[in-house]
A protein has these predicted regions:
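N-terminal small/polar-rich segments of proteins
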Residues: 24-145, 151, 162-212
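Extracellular glycan-recognition regions
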Residues: 150-156
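Bacterial N-terminal signal peptides that target proteins for export
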Residues: 1-10
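Hydrophobic helical h-region of N-terminal Sec-dependent signal peptides
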Residues: 10-16
């Protein structure tokens, strides 16, 4: 059998099957029944809406337009106190972040009830020489961005933070964002070095959102 004949047979089989696949209800009435009850046909509809959970911290896709996508960019926030500032207890603002100045866009969009948010670090930030700075020395301050209420930020810890629970309204839909501003509290004099970094020396924090 050549390819052309095979394709014709396949097309014919599909054509024969189409009425079966696309069949719908039909009803015939004759005589007086054409006036009452008349001919009726029914169609059933189903709309399948997937659960959606979107989390953004830093660089990411737009989320106010409905075009939610994934973006693998990981931002780096850097704190650089001067020698005179080290350990003086005055908080040091960061550099970097998608909003600059150590400020990140944070957003949650969901459609199926309450959302639980937390942050996990492997341990204290290290310098590779045995010295550490605890994540409790990095403070996150949440302020409003576009939503009426700012998205709360988990308090960073040398491990998994306490949960932040976002309570969904009756619609079960959450759209909440904030500007998260990071600061190094600078409460102690520590040995010189680069603590943490881009996914090295426990420098990475993983934020996780979950939804039932």
């Amino acid at each position: 059998m050549n390819k052309l004949v095979g394709l014709k047979i396949l097309a014919g089989a599909v054509a024969l099957a189409l009425p079966l696949l696309a069949s719908a209800e039909s009803n015939v009435q004759t005589g007086a029944a054409t006036a009452a009850p008349g001919a009726t046909a029914h169609v059933d509809f189903t709309i399948v809406i997937p659960k959606i959970l979107y989390l953004r911290v830093g660089t990411g896709s737009a989320y106010t337009t409905g075009a939610l996508t994934s973006n693998g960019t990981v931002d780096l926030i850097t704190f650089s106190p001067t020698p005179a500032q080290v350990g003086n207890g005055v908080a040091i603002p960061g550099t970097g972040g998608d909003l600059a100045g150590g400020v990140e866009t944070a957003a949650v969009v969901s459609n199926s009830g309450n959302v639980t948010l937390n942050a996990t670090a492997t341990g204290a930030l290290g310098d590779g020489a045995g010295d550490t700075i605890p994540f409790t020395e990095i403070k996150t301050t949440a302020t409003t961005l576009t939503s009426a209420t700012a998205l709360p930020a988990p308090v960073l810890a040398n491990g998994t933070s306490a949960n932040v629970v976002l309570i969904a309204p009756a619609t079960k839909v959450i759209v909440q964002d904030a500007k998260w501003t990071y600061a190094y509290l600078n409460n102690a004099v520590v040995p010189g070095g680069n603590y943490g970094g881009a996914n090295v020396n426990n420098g990475r924090v993983v934020y996780t959102a979950t939804m039932p």
